[in-house]
Structure formats: structure tokens, C-alpha cells
Amino acid sequence: MKRMIALDGAQGEGGGQILRSALSLSMITGQPFTITSIRAGRAKPGLLRQHLTAVKAAAEICRATVEGAELGSQRLVFRPGTVRGGEYRFAIGSAGSCTLVLQTVLPALWFADGPSRVEVSGGTDNPSAPPADFIRRVLEPLLAKIGIHQQTTLLRHGFYPAGGGVVATEVSPVASFNTLQLGERGNIVQMCGEVLLAGVPRHVAEREIATLAGSFSLHEQNIHNLPRDQGPGNTVSLEVESENITERFFVVGEKRVSAEVVAAQLVKEVKRYLASPAAVGEYLADQLVLPMALAGAGEFKVAHPSCHLLTNIAVVERFLPVRFGLIETDGVTRVSIE
């Protein structure tokens, strides 16, 4: 019998990432775990619908036995079984993030006995989670370089608080892993601005695009009007295509916050990224730790290593026989497997 790994959910940033990473790694390695103080660092601790959906999805895919899988629970015991490929559908029942549920279960399906399709309904444009376009346009091309082949499709948008969005991913088992090397970004090829609107006046998007264009030379300026029943909602994105990587940044609009202020938040974030030669942005770095660890080798450079990143590394090192090294030089941190 494999040893039970004990995790403290209050460590590091104290959020849901500890639980999601632990679920992924437990499914892959077959190691059971117990976690206490779940989301202790949040205003509303314990399992929310999004986290509970991730737990139940993981349990279904690998026939796990679970203790503590209920709303508000701050303790969970997860004993995994065998991962099975196939077609799965999960409903969050709120505007909780579809992509974070997918992020939890897809790594295990890289090792399944056949191809899979996972569809999740819930929120698609959440200020604290990567949108589907980030997964599709930024992360998945990098996963393909590692040898991981999956394809994400956004079927319907769902903004907070109504939700109702749908995201699906098709994934194939990994034949072999390659080493990812991401150093400097290189020269910028082009930058593209995009605004999504659902039940929001078009002039909001026009003002947001104008704010972006006031700071950057945009190759494309796209405004997409979605059906009213998918909102109300508004998201502003800016994609930076460079010689060695494509990065994408976004901000979700808020009630009583002007279009100019929303877009200015995005401008600030992109300028922060461009101020460093590092290829990888703060949020992408979080997503690369697990696939790189599974490959057993690789490195990337990031200007601003987040608490999320450090927490994720700590959890990965509990489950896998790998050690990460972080070396900071001239404001750029090199993250590598030692």
C-alpha cells in the first residue's frame, strides 16, 4: 500500500491550487493524500462548488474513494484508483471556473488507457482563473512541444454570477515527453487587442480598445458581441506574440468600474511583462510546473515568480521524485528541474 501524503492547505498562498495539484498528482501516481485547512487563506474557507466539482470529477475518472467531499469542508481524504479514459461531463452549478476543473483532471488523462473528452459547465470568464483562450492559444502550444496533445474549445461563454458557460477538451495519452526550454521572449512580432461583450453597450468595448491602442501598437483590434443571455459580462484581452512565445493577458470588467480603468489595469499588467526579457508571464509559470515535472527535465525564465508558483512546486515535490531550482539574476528567475 502506498503511503498517505499529508498536506496543509494553509501553506503558501493557502488557496485552491494546493488541492487541485494534489488531486492531479494523486491520480497520476496512485498515492493517496489527506489535506487539512483547505483554502484557509481565503475569506470563505473550505470547498466551494468549483473545488467540490474538481474533487468529484477526479474521483469519477479514477474511481477514487473520498472522505470530506462536501461544500464548506476543510478536510479531505482522497484514495485514487485507476485512471480511465472516456467521455466525461461535469457541472459546477455556479459561475466557478470551468478551466480550473479541467486543469485538475486533464493531467491524469495524459496517462489514460485511451483518448478522452471532458466537458465542464460553469463560469468561463473569471478574474481569478485562466480563460479558455489562454489555455488554447498560450498553454496548449507549449504542451504540444512537451509531447502533450489536447485541444480545448469554448462552446458557450458564462460570466459571473450567472455562469452557464461550457468548455470542452479532447486529450490523447502521451506517447513520450520532450524537454521544454523557454528562456528569453525575443522580439515582439505583433500585439492584438480583443474585447468580449454580452449584454453590455458597444461603446464600452470601443473605449477599452482605445485605451489599449493609446499604449501599444495593435496589429488587430477585435470586438466580439456575444448573445445577451451569455451575460452580462465584459472581458478585455491583449495577446503578445514574440519570437519564442505567445502570451495572453486579460481583465474581466466589473460593475461601476469604467472601461478606461478596466483597460488600464490590463495595460499595467502587460507593461510589467514587457519590462523583462523573460519569456514566461506570472500566470503561465504556474501552469508549466506540473508538465515539466512529469517530463523530468526543462526550464523557463519568469520575471515575477508568484506565491502560486512556489506553492505548486512544493506540492509537486511531495508527489514526484523531482527537485526544482530557482535562481534569480538581474530581476529574472530561472526555474529548472535539478
Swiss-Prot record:
Enzyme Commission designation: 6.5.1.4
InterPro entries: RNA3'-term_phos_cycl_insert, RNA3'_phos_cyclase_dom, RNA3'_phos_cyclase_dom_sf, RNA3'_term_phos_cyc, RNA3'_term_phos_cyc_type_1, RNA3'_term_phos_cycl-like_CS, RNA3'P_cycl/enolpyr_Trfase_a/b, RPTC_insert
Top EC group: ligase
UniProt entry keywords in alphabetical sequence: ATP-binding, Cytoplasm, Ligase, Nucleotide-binding
Gene name of the record: rtcA
Keyword Ligase applies: yes
Chief location of this protein within or outside the cell: cytoplasm
Location(s), subcellular: Cytoplasm
Species, as recorded: Escherichia coli O139:H28 (strain E24377A / ETEC)
Binding-site residues for ATP, renumbered to this chain: 103, 283-287
Family listed: Belongs to the RNA 3'-terminal cyclase family. Type 1 subfamily.
Record-level GO BP terms: RNA processing
Biological role stated in the UniProt entry: Catalyzes the conversion of 3'-phosphate to a 2',3'-cyclic phosphodiester at the end of RNA. The mechanism of action of the enzyme occurs in 3 steps: (A) adenylation of the enzyme by ATP; (B) transfer of adenylate to an RNA-N3'P to produce RNA-N3'PP5'A; (C) and attack of the adjacent 2'-hydroxyl on the 3'-phosphorus in the diester linkage to produce the cyclic end product. The biological role of this enzyme is unknown but it is likely to function in some aspects of cellular RNA processing.
Catalyzed reactions: a 3'-end 3'-phospho-ribonucleotide-RNA + ATP = a 3'-end 2',3'-cyclophospho-ribonucleotide-RNA + AMP + diphosphate
Protein name per UniProt: RNA 3'-terminal phosphate cyclase
GO molecular function: ATP binding; RNA-3'-phosphate cyclase activity
Active site: 308
UniProt-listed HAMAP family: RTC
Record PROSITE patterns: RTC
GO cellular component, one term: cytoplasm
